[in-house]
Amino acid sequence: MYILTAEAKDLYNTNHLKNGNGSGYCIRTKAGNINVKKFINALDYSLDLIKLREIYEKIYRRHDFSFKINGKEYTKHVINVKFSYAQKEFNKAGNNIYVRSGYQYKDIKLEDHICVVDDKLIGIEVDMEVDEPYKNLSVLEDYFTYEDGRYKNIGNDIILNKSELRQELYLYENGFVCDGIKYVRWKRSSGSSRVGKCLFINEALYQRMHKWETCNLKIKDGQPLDLAAFEAYISLTSSSIIDTLEIKPENFLLIDDYESVFKDTVVGVEFEEGHLVSKTKEYEIHNSIFDGESLIDESLVPDKYKHYGMLLLRNRFFKSASFNCNIQQWFKDNNITDTGQLNGFTLAQDISEIKIITTPSSIKYCKFGTAEQWLKLIEPTFGIVKHEKPTHYFNGRMVSCHYQLINTLQLTEKDMQDLLEPSFDYISKVRNDPAILRYHINYPYNEMPLTPLNSKNEIIFKLLGINENFSKTSLYYDFRDDLIRSMIRELKQGHVLINGNYSTLLGNGLEMLQHSIGTFNGESVIGKGNIHSTRFEYDKTILGSRSPHICAGNVLVVKNVANEEIDRYFNLSNEVVYVNAIGENIQQRLNGCDYAPSCGDTGMKTW
């Protein structure tokens, strides 16, 4: 759904016009229609959008929260505000045109490139030939001058800089008016805050939306608060989702997080006498082994997602990578028949109701209140943000490497030749065999629709599928040569295809099941230096690399081991790898990874 984007300085200016009409910032054309060209940002399908529509219909008693034009959906009840420019005494309103603060370009009439009202300069066009200068040049003040037959800009006063526009009462506290609707500050995501954007909302919707997104938390004036974290938490429901699923409060079992504490010899960085100094020494390592992950029973997973091993779920103050697990089978095998046998908190009255196991690290509300309060406040609709996916190369069997990893491995020239040899062989086959080229471009020839041909590439794709003799034409040769040049260019940038994939990390999942019934003894099931992945052969050495690859230390050499218990109780795909963080420095080696896929994806390669 598209939403309006506006500059803070324009909102400020149109809300402080000398001849203001009360309608504020104008989003309409001269004909009175909404100018959808200004709607350049999108409000993703999310829990926020679902709730916004619901609240709007309750308040206004109608169903026009959004409108459609040419197949696209728009809403004017949320506005994305940017703070890119300061508000100046004279603001640019087009090429070489300046308009005084408090006025709009449409309100001025330039005569010989200048507009003066009651001996006050309102607008001016600079660097253009003037037939005759204005009779009283003092109206130019210290902002403009007249020389060589043209008006020139020589200075400008800043009324409010970008920071002041953000903090100024006019926006954050008083809000602004747009198209006759009052808007107030709503929220911003961590990504938006980095680029200085913020969402504003129709004031009539704000109170109910804010009460909902904060789970009724009451933050008092002067109360100590990690504001950056709080803003991030209330923005969890604005994340784009692909689907929803229903989880009832009684389906939850909340267990304690577990921290593995041990010592390891690492290269540590310390601050000494005003300098950062790196030293190899023994440090105490703390790993939260269930950080950011949950276990979800297979029966709760929607049918179309049952073949995935992980679903990233969001709700109010909840964010967790939820791994496909046979929780009820675990309870049955361990003779757990009553909720009193569980090692955690639940609202369930019967053991069969337990469908998801999580920890306080996934429930952000626990930083402000209790898990019991959160369970009583949440609605059963959870958003599915994403799931693990195979790569696009060779049906997920290959993964594209990158120059950071190649530099980390410090390969010799001979090693590099060995690494590139399969790629060169493949390029040679693409050059010489049209069937392999067809496979490479991966075009669905059996489902070719009879549609207009919109590009040269599409013509090539379809002709290759229709007649093999097309591979003997000059058009085919040109296409093939362009493709090969592109493949070689990718190799030069370090994008080498290797046997591997991107895998989401599942940390100590079986230990989490043990912890849920009180049998966890603090020991790892697979042991140090091992992983469990169905993607690779067992008893083989695997090289894992953090993605994104931040530094040369983001590599992990481990052994892939078989484990019948993991296979029995977890429904893992090839893109989920079971890892161990008990007594093993995996989290810091991978730069503080947790098990949410936003920062726990790891490229795996047989080595």
Q: What is the predicted role of each segment?
A:
Residues 589, 602-607:
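Short active-site loop/helix that positions an aromatic residue
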Residues 1-588:
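Conserved small-residue
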Residues 594, 599:
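Duplex nucleic acid-engaging cores and interfaces of nucleic-acid transaction enzymes
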Residues 504-507, 593, 604:
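Hydrophobic, aliphatic-enriched repeat segments that assemble into extended interaction scaffolds
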